[in-house]
């Protein structure tokens, strides 16, 4: 899989911002077919950062009610990437 297809976007929430500051962990929305090895390679290549661990979570899409009946949002995959000491990804800085 191409490294540009692995990572879709960074996941920026209150929880991920606290984890970035405390534990040097960043979160991404990734392709559902990507595995931990591909995610690690993509982060190291795209952001020039040293990765120590990757944890993934498959998030189930929510069921939503609409005027036409019941629909479902897509399932998606989230990756928590732990960076080694001294490594930093600067897209969180304003």
Swiss-Prot record:
SUPFAM superfamilies recorded for this chain? Ribosomal proteins S24e, L23 and L15e
Quick check: keyword RNA-binding in the entry?
yes
Q: Which UniProt keywords apply?
A: Ribonucleoprotein, Ribosomal protein, RNA-binding, rRNA-binding
Q: Which Pfam families match?
A: Ribosomal_L23
The GO terms this record gives for MF are: rRNA binding; structural constituent of ribosome
GO terms (BP aspect): translation
Do you know which InterPro entries this protein is assigned to?
Nucleotide-bd_a/b_plait_sf, Ribosomal_uL23-like, Ribosomal_uL23/eL15/eS24_sf, Ribosomal_uL23_CS
Coiled-coil boundaries: none
Q: Name one GO cellular component term.
A: ribosome
State the family it belongs to. Belongs to the universal ribosomal protein uL23 family.
What do we know about how this protein assembles, alone or with others? Part of the 50S ribosomal subunit. Contacts protein L29, and trigger factor when it is bound to the ribosome.
Q: Explain the purpose of this protein.
A: One of the early assembly proteins it binds 23S rRNA. One of the proteins that surrounds the polypeptide exit tunnel on the outside of the ribosome. Forms the main docking site for trigger factor binding to the ribosome.
Question: What's the name of the protein?
Answer: Large ribosomal subunit protein uL23
Q: Which organism is it from?
A: Citrifermentans bemidjiense (strain ATCC BAA-1014 / DSM 16622 / JCM 12645 / Bem) (Geobacter bemidjiensis)
Lineage per the UniProt record: Bacteria, Pseudomonadati, Thermodesulfobacteriota, Desulfuromonadia, Geobacterales
Which gene specifies this protein's sequence? rplW
């Amino acid at each position: 899989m191409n490294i540009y297809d692995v990572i879709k976007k960074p996941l920026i929430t209150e929880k991920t911002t606290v984890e970035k500051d405390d534990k040097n962990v960043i979160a991404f929305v990734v392709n559902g077919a990507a595995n931990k090895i591909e995610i690690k390679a993509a982060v190291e290549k795209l952001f020039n950062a040293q990765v120590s661990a990757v944890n993934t979570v498959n998030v189930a899409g929510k069921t939503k009610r609409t005027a036409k009946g019941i629909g479902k949002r897509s399932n998606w995959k989230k990756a928590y990437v732990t960076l080694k000491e001294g490594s930093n990804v600067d897209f969180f800085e304003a």
